[in-house]
């Protein structure tokens, strides 16, 4: 289905790019679990500032690169059905077969999604 495809593409992006994976787990999922439904650019910027303290390569990013990265991550979240256009986190309703695929890895790739299902 379209929903499954979006979820799998989001998981693939998280697997490929550590920065996106960490944002998904540390910000998107945590905000969902804390029942704080809004997600906006300031959350991404704060996340990057924190990462820049420990990663020189993040600190060296130009503002134009940060803006493009932010824009792409938010567009991907919207296209995956995990974020509304107005910035509200949409709980991931993972199908059984997608959930099985994501759980096959250790730690589970479910950790990249706004869901109460186990992700560790």
Locate each region found by the language model:
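Hydrophobic, aromatic-lined core segments that form the binding pocket/scaffold
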Residues: 2-7
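Positively charged, polyanion-binding regions of nucleic-acid-associated proteins
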Residues: 9-11, 15-38
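Short, amphipathic alpha-helical segments
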Residues: 14, 18, 38-42, 63-71
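Contiguous, well-ordered alpha-helical segments that form the cores/surfaces of helical PPI scaffolds
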Residues: 22-26, 46, 75
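Amphipathic alpha-helical interaction surfaces
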Residues: 26, 30, 34, 50-54, ...
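Short acidic alpha-helical/loop segments enriched in Asp/Glu that coordinate divalent cations
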Residues: 33-41, 57-61, 88
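DNA-recognition alpha helix
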Residues: 40-56
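Accessory, usually C-terminal, subdomains that scaffold auxiliary metal cofactors
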Residues: 59-120
């Amino acid at each position: 289905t379209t929903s499954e495809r979006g979820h799998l593409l989001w998981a693939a992006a998280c697997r490929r790019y550590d920065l996106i994976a960490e944002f998904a787990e540390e910000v998107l999922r945590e905000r969902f679990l804390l029942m704080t439904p809004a997600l906006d650019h300031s959350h991404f910027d704060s996340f990057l500032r924190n990462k820049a303290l420990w990663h020189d390569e993040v600190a060296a990013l130009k503002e134009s690169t940060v803006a493009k990265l932010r824009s792409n991550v938010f567009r991907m979240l919207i296209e995956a059905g995990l974020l509304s256009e107005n910035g509200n986190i949409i709980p991931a309703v993972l199908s059984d077969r997608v959930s099985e695929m994501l759980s096959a890895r250790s730690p589970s790739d479910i950790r990249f999604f706004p869901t109460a299902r186990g992700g560790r």
